[in-house]
Design a protein with these regions (language model features):
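Conserved active-site segment immediately N-terminal to the catalytic lysine
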Residues: 5-38, 68-69, 73-78
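Active-site PLP attachment segment
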Residues: 22-65, 88
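PLP-dependent aminotransferase class I/II
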Residues: 14, 50-150
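A short helix->loop->beta-strand "cap" motif at the edges of active sites that frequently abuts
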Residues: 1
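Active-site flanking residues adjacent to catalytic metal/cofactor-binding acidic residues
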Residues: 4-5, 87
């Protein structure tokens, strides 16, 4: 069984002092405009497995094998694929955003503490129990549930 980690909202997070994203076979990351860093849309998949890497590389490029013995487009297609290639400009935006990640995580942590302080004043709102780990996106998932008062 191949395990794919959904790390779309956890960029920069840690668990047991280890960065998330390399515990499983593959990891999915999102760079949508609502995430910790953004390129406007899209994301990436990371893996240390050569077979998975080759498959993902082909899949994102219309299924091209990118065989160096043949010109691009004349190589074989063993799988169907789509156009999920990232342009250079989107990649450049991502690199600039990545430089801001530590500051984004720090600001999110400050925001979480402010929200937590305010929300604790309302007994009908239950806060999620957050473990003592670095969570980059936690302020957006603060409330566990509301008690309805009828």
């Amino acid at each position: 069984i191949v395990v794919i980690d959904d790390n779309c909202e956890a960029l920069g997070s840690t668990w047991s002092k280890k960065s998330l994203g390399n515990q499983f076979d593959m990891c999915a990351w999102s760079f949508d405009n609502g995430k910790s860093i953004t390129t406007g849309e899209g994301g990436m998949i990371t893996t240390n497995n050569k077979k998975f890497y080759n498959y993902c590389t082909q899949y994102k490029d219309h299924g091209h094998e990118n065989n160096p013995k043949f010109p691009r487009g004349r190589d074989t297609h063993k799988i169907y694929g789509f156009n999920y290639r990232v342009s250079e400009i989107v990649g450049a935006i991502g690199l600039i955003q990545l430089r801001k990640l530590k500051k984004v995580i720090k600001n999110n942590s400050i925001r979480y503490k402010i929200y937590e302080k305010i929300i604790k004043k309302f007994p009908e709102v239950n806060l999620r129990k957050i473990p003592k780990v670095r969570i980059s996106y936690v302020y957006r998932n603060l409330v566990q549930y509301f008690k309805l008062l009828l």
